[in-house]
Amino acid sequence: MPRLNCVAATAIIAFVVALNIAEGARRTPVVRQVDHIVIESGDPRILFNFFAETLQLPIAWPITENQGFVSGGIGAGNVNLEIFRYASTPRNRNASYSGLAFEPYPLPDALRDLKLRGIPYSTPEAYVSLLPSGSRGTAWTTVALPAFSRPGMSIFLYEYSPLFLKIEVRRKQLANRLTLSKGGPLGLSSLSEVSIATTDKKRDSAAWSALLGKPAQSGNWRAGAGPAIRLVQGGGEGIREITLSVESLEMARDFLKKSRLMGATSGKGMLINASRIQGLRILITGEGER
C-alpha cells in the first residue's frame, strides 16, 4: 500500500505540473493589448489641444483638473493617449512618454499567469470612484510590473471595471469616430508602434517575450490590435518614440507642410516637428511601412 500510495502521489504531482504548464501556455500573451500610452507634460492643455484640434483626433475623455492633477484622453484608433500633469510637475518641462498601460485578460487569470511565468508584479491598486449607477465602487485597477518599469517609465496592467466602463464598446466608438473623420487631416489609421530604448536588449527581450510571447519576424511584439513594441539598443531607457500609420503619406506630408509641423524625414517616413509638440518624437509612416 505505501508503494502504491507513493506511485499515486507521484502521478498526481506529475498531472498537476503538466496541468499548470498547459494552463500557463494556454494564454499567450498575458495581456490583450496596449490600452493607453501615458504622456507627462508641463502644459497638458496645449498638448491635448494639438491632438484634439490640430490633428482632429477623437476625445476619449475631456481634459480635467482635480486637486492639481490634470488628465485628458485622445483616441488614436487602436489605443488611447493620456496626457497628464501631476501637481508637482514643473510647468515649463517638455513632454515625455512616461508609461504604458496594458489591458489584461481578466485580472485574476492574468496574475495567475504572471506567477506561472515568474514575472513579478505589485499588489493590485483599485481606484474607487462614482460609478454610472450613482454608487461608489472600483472604477479601475492597476498592477505595476517592476521588471519592465524604469525611472521615468511605468509599465503596468490596467483593468477597467465593467460597472464603470465597457472598454471594448468605447474602443469601437472611438475607432468609428476616427473612421468617420477619415483620420483627420493627417489621415490617421492607427498607432502602429511604440519604440522603447534599452541599455540591455538581450535582457529586456527575454522579459518582453515572457510577457507577450515570441516576437514576430520583425523582432517586434504585438498583442491584439494594439501597437507593436520595438526595443532599440542604446539611448538610455524609456519610451523613445511612437509611430502613427496614415492612409496616405503624401496627404500627411502636405498637411504637415501647410501647418508648419514638418520635421526630419527618413526612409520610413517623417517626424512631426518636435518643437511644436513639446519635444515628443512622433514618426509618421504609410500603412505598409510599419
Feature roles, as predicted:
Residues 44-58, 109-117, 200-215, 252-258:
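Amphipathic alpha-helical segments
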Residues 8-20:
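Bacterial N-terminal signal peptides
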Residues 32-42, 72-74, 90-187, 190-200, 217-220, 226-233, 253-290, ...:
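Vicinal oxygen chelate
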Residues 34-41, 161-165, 173-217, 221:
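Surface-exposed interaction/gating patches
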Residues 22-24:
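Boundary at the C-terminal end of the N-terminal hydrophobic targeting segment
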Residues 26-85, 94-97:
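An N-terminus-focused feature that recognizes amino-terminal "leader" regions
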Residues 1-6:
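Positively charged n-region of N-terminal signal peptides that target proteins for export
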